[in-house]
């Protein structure tokens, strides 16, 4: 629910009538002013942290205050908002994603862009709509739950590639991505009026 989402920028919580660094594009995300001004103020009990900012924004103390089994998407590159080992040291139940390939759950646009475009090209689509994006998301989710092929398993050595906290998203070089995502988009495009 939108009222459960709090957006922060380099100046803190984006709240209504905030003056410093309040661009018009941020105003749509402004929450009522309840006196909470920092990420540390609003992270208490949070289920999800989605960071696309810079290194060391999320501290271990903040992670401790999050809800049970929090999802932490620390996506800044090359150094995320918090490194997975630091988060796991204080919250073993955390599900952590980064943009880095040297940690589990790498979130990278390489998982979808090539295959979304392939699907669009296959049907002559001139635009990528929300339904096509959702079809890609559902195809990726299906793959994350599917049993791994020998090709994928051999490419990633002894890593456990069964769905769980350290594997919620397919690996970028999973050859099944193209055969799942592109056709899923094609079906959506064809079924639309």
Model segments located where?
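Short acidic, glycine/serine/threonine-rich loops at helix termini
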Residues: 1, 16-21, 61-63, 83-88, ...
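Residue-level detector of conserved catalytic or cofactor/ligand-binding positions
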Residues: 186-193
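Short glycine/threonine-rich loop-to-helix capping motif typified by GTGT followed
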Residues: 1, 63-64, 163, 175
């Amino acid at each position: 629910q939108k009222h459960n989402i709090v957006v922060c920028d380099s100046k803190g919580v984006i709240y209504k009538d905030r003056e410093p660094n309040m661009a018009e594009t941020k105003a749509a995300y402004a929450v009522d002013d309840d006196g909470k001004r920092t990420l540390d103020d609003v992270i208490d009990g949070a289920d999800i942290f989605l960071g696309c900012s810079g290194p060391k924004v999320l501290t271990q103390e903040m992670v401790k205050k999050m809800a049970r089994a929090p999802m932490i998407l620390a996506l800044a590159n090359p150094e995320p908002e918090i490194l997975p080992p630091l988060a796991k040291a204080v919250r073993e139940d955390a599900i952590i994603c980064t943009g880095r390939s040297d940690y589990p759950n790498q979130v990278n646009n390489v998982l979808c862009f090539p295959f979304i475009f392939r699907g669009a090209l296959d049907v002559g689509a001139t635009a990528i709509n929300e339904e096509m994006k959702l079809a890609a998301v559902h195809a990726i989710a299906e793959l994350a739950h599917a049993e791994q092929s020998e090709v994928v398993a051999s490419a990633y050595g002894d890593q456990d590639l069964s769905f769980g906290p350290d594997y919620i998203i397919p690996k970028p070089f999973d050859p099944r991505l193209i055969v799942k995502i592109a056709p899923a988009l094609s079906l959506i495009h064809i079924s639309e009026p």
